[in-house]
């Protein structure tokens, strides 16, 4: 299955890439996702597979220091997880303190070099989810679509190919 290279990932929290900023420093803004019902491990593994990333740091709730007590039924949940990409990372955790409300107005944007790779990622993320804008050509791109995946994360998937 063609996957293409991820050019950049955007979210309300920032851009998933390294940028040089004034003064010569570099920065990296990374979306951080919260999952209810202990679904972080499953979701992040799915995203790593679909978006051709690699699972990085994983911290289980059971490994938290004693000053951070965790309910017994949540010890298998994740306190932190990372999916690494060449230019950044996607991070997440389970909502250990209680249910997390979805962010209003926030989406994770992934832009691929090719329409084929973008459409493939869109269709795989859509499994068990709901399309809010079907993947199709637009006036700015050969392919773009929006969806909420089965974990409740809202995605915008596009490509660099001209319409």
Question: What is the predicted function of each stretch?
Answer:
Residues 57-76:
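N-terminal G-site of the GST-like fold
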Residues 5-11, 15-25, 29, 35, ...:
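Vicinal oxygen chelate
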Residues 36-41:
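Short acidic-aromatic low-complexity motifs
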Residues 104:
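Acidic/polar active-site rim loop that often engages polyanionic ligands
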Residues 43-51:
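Amphipathic alpha-helical segments
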């Amino acid at each position: 299955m063609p996957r293409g290279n991820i050019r950049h990932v955007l979210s309300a929290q920032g851009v998933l890439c390294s940028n040089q900023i004034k003064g010569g420093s570099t920065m990296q803004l990374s979306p951080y996702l919260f999952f209810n019902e202990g679904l972080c491990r499953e979701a992040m593994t799915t995203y790593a597979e679909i978006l051709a990333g690699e699972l990085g740091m994983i911290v289980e709730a059971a490994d938290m220091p004693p000053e951070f007590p965790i309910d017994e039924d949540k010890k298998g949940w994740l306190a932190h997880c990372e999916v690494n990409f060449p230019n950044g990372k996607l991070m997440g955790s389970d909502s250990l303190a209680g249910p997390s409300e979805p962010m209003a107005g926030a989406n994770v944007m992934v832009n691929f070099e090719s329409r084929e790779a973008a459409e493939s990622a869109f269709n795989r993320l859509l499994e068990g989810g709901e399309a809010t804008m079907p993947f199709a050509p637009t006036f700015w791109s050969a392919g773009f679509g929006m969806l909420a995946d089965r974990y409740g994360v809202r995605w915008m998937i596009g490509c660099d190919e001209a319409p």
